[in-house]
Amino acid sequence: MSPQTETKASVGFKAGVKDYKLTYYTPDYETKDTDILAAFRVTPQPGVPPEEAGAAVAAESSTGTWTTVWTDGLTSLDRYKGRCYHIEPVAGDENQYICYVAYPLDLFEEGSVTNMFTSIVGNVFGFKALRALRLEDLRIPPSYTKTFQGPPHGIQVERDKLNKYGRPLLGCTIKPKLGLSAKNYGRAVYECLRGGLDFTKDDENVNSQPFMRWRDRFLFCAEAIFKSQAETGEIKGHYLNATAGTCEEMMKRAVFARELGVPIVMHDYLTGGFTANTSLAHYCRDNGLLLHIHRAMHAVIDRQKNHGIHFRVLAKALRMSGGDHIHAGTVVGKLEGERDITLGFVDLLRDDFIEKDRSRGIYFTQDWVSLPGVLPVASGGIHVWHMPALTEIFGDDSVLQFGGGTLGHPWGNAPGAVANRVALEACVQARNEGRDLAREGNEIIREASKWSPELAAACEVWKEIKFEFEAMDTL
């Protein structure tokens, strides 16, 4: 060891354990434009001060370990450490705090959501000093955002590819999700598309099972797409799920979809992983495929209010990793989603610049610069009576996806698709004429049903269906 190294390593080194807050709690720190900022909901163990808990989070998610180590002297910890720079109590929740942590940009590999999450949430959630920990939001600086490709195409490019403007897009998940043969599955796709839907969809767990291998499904769905396009004169698509057990197999399925000439494929981005998702997104941009993203497994991570990762963070991560659509709740259907919070992360998916707004759960102003937007998908327990509310809540730049609300129509799949298309067109026309969808929605649907027997039948079937449960994801 050289004398210079010996001197550097030994200066200021004292073995033992010291409080995290002495090094990582820095309330006077002024954040930099290049810092990645995180807002954590921290519940310390009894007797642990919030300053120590916040500093522990900053340390364990950056440069810290449980004891002083002599190699600290070989680098500049002050340059690379995370800093807990602000702490505020959570109103109405005793012994719970929002701790704000700033991370220097040099801690993260460029263009890697995988590395970002491994650093920020990879280890600290098991820390004994904390009873619970939840990552509520991240501020991604433009200097880091620009290292990502993001969505393969984005909202405007997708509309141009589909030649569809001025309304939400309509979709349907094929049911039953498991058990159909490839030919019967393709038949259901064809009926829904010719009835007026823009898209149909593989469910998240449709991959390549014994009853329906992926190649057979792709072939029959492609046939359904091209036949329905010829009949309707509209561009159609089916979300062909390319998710697989290996990245190589996933890419093989995406390549086959491109060779068939279909417009869109699908990926389960949380179960498939961010590395696989980013690879697929790059392939889709290079080869003209749209990419639909399912968030299977998200509620395991984001549903508990005190522990985990909020979906707004997972949504930001998806926009960075890449996807043209992502499921985002419905507010009115069977799946979790409170209105203001849902609209907060919907804006984070679609807009270029989003101001801080704590009333919608947005802790930081986010500037996406030139990163393309993502279409939010409303799916889960919705039907024609929900159409006015969905159109009013999500606006034109969205995908409204009715599975049971299409295939459950008493006259069949195609009439179910007709009912949804008529309901949507009626709501869009009423909105464009200045009518209040929130107040007059039911009347608008009833008026339209006079001219559409398919819609009238759907209205009768689902007139009593409601999902009235209180959302768990509240501010």
From Swiss-Prot:
Binds 1 Mg(2+) ion per subunit. The active site is at K175 (proton acceptor), H294 (proton acceptor). Pfam families: RuBisCO_large, RuBisCO_large_N. Its cofactor is Mg(2+). The modification N6,N6,N6-trimethyllysine is found at K14. The modification N-acetylproline is found at P3. It catalyses: 2 (2R)-3-phosphoglycerate + 2 H(+) = D-ribulose 1,5-bisphosphate + CO2 + H2O; D-ribulose 1,5-bisphosphate + O2 = 2-phosphoglycolate + (2R)-3-phosphoglycerate + 2 H(+). The keyword RNA-binding does not apply. The basic functional RuBisCO is composed of a large chain homodimer in a 'head-to-tail' conformation. In form I RuBisCO this homodimer is arranged in a barrel-like tetramer with the small subunits forming a tetrameric 'cap' on each end of the 'barrel'. PANTHER family: RIBULOSE BISPHOSPHATE CARBOXYLASE, RIBULOSE BISPHOSPHATE CARBOXYLASE LARGE CHAIN. This is Ribulose bisphosphate carboxylase large chain. It comes from Eucalyptus globulus subsp. globulus (Tasmanian blue gum).
